[in-house]
């Protein structure tokens, strides 16, 4: 990807929580929800609960949730990857993929997040404002929508259904 700008989310390779390279190309054809997560945020419990509901309901139909821990907002994800995985899998019972901790803003912003923000800027500024900013990505890898941290996952369930191609009329 040297000089070419990415055409879709599938052009990226990220690290999983174990430090292994994961090509997002493996998610081609799936509807993705990309979320920056934190374990010690006031929004944590409600978001994980609703993300789990959506994942359970739609994973068989092609929804994949990609969670990226981030410690940039008041240090609310302070643990190492092992601690984060333990918390997310045990306390929050998440079964969706958890990736390596990333920066979503600043000079060390993960390339994936640079792309997401460029595709769907925020209200007033493109920077990620807080934990649990969510990006909905179509099965062909295009960013469809960006949701603020205060928008609960169940509030945009209809958008997920539409992206999955199964919105009820």
From Swiss-Prot:
Q: Which gene encodes it?
A: GPX2
Family membership noted in the UniProt record: Belongs to the glutathione peroxidase family.
Cited Gene3D superfamilies = Glutaredoxin
Q: What is this protein called?
A: Probable glutathione peroxidase 2
Q: Which reaction does it catalyse?
A: 2 glutathione + H2O2 = glutathione disulfide + 2 H2O
Q: How does it assemble?
A: Interacts with DJ1A.
Q: What is its main location?
A: cytoplasm
CDD domains according to UniProt: GSH_Peroxidase (cd00340)
- Top enzyme category: oxidoreductase
Q: What is expression of this protein induced or repressed by? A: By salt stress and metals. Up-regulated by salicylic acid (SA).
Q: In which tissues is it expressed?
A: Expressed in leaves, stems, flowers, green siliques and roots.
Q: Where in the cell is it found?
A: Cytoplasm, Cytosol; Nucleus
What lineage is on file? Eukaryota, Viridiplantae, Streptophyta, Embryophyta, Tracheophyta
The record's function comment reads: May constitute a glutathione peroxidase-like protective system against oxidative stresses.
Instruction: Give the matching SUPFAM superfamilies.
Output: Thioredoxin-like
């Amino acid at each position: 990807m040297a000089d070419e700008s990415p055409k879709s989310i599938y052009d990226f390779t990220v690290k999983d929580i174990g430090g292994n390279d994961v090509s997002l190309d493996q998610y081609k054809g799936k509807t993705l929800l990309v979320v920056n997560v934190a374990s010690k945020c006031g929004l944590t419990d409600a978001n994980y609960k609703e993300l789990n509901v959506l994942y359970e309901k739609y994973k068989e139909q092609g929804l994949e949730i990609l969670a990226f821990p981030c410690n940039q907002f008041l240090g609310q994800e302070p643990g190492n990857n092992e601690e984060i995985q333990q918390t997310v899998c045990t306390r929050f019972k998440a079964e969706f993929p958890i990736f390596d901790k990333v920066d979503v803003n600043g000079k060390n912003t993960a390339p994936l997040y640079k792309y997401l923000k460029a595709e769907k800027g925020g209200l007033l500024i493109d920077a990620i404002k807080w934990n649990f900013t969510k990006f909905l990505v179509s099965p062909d890898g295009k960013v469809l929508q960006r949701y603020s941290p205060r928008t609960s996952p169940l509030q945009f369930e209809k958008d997920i259904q539409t992206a999955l191609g199964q919105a009820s009329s």
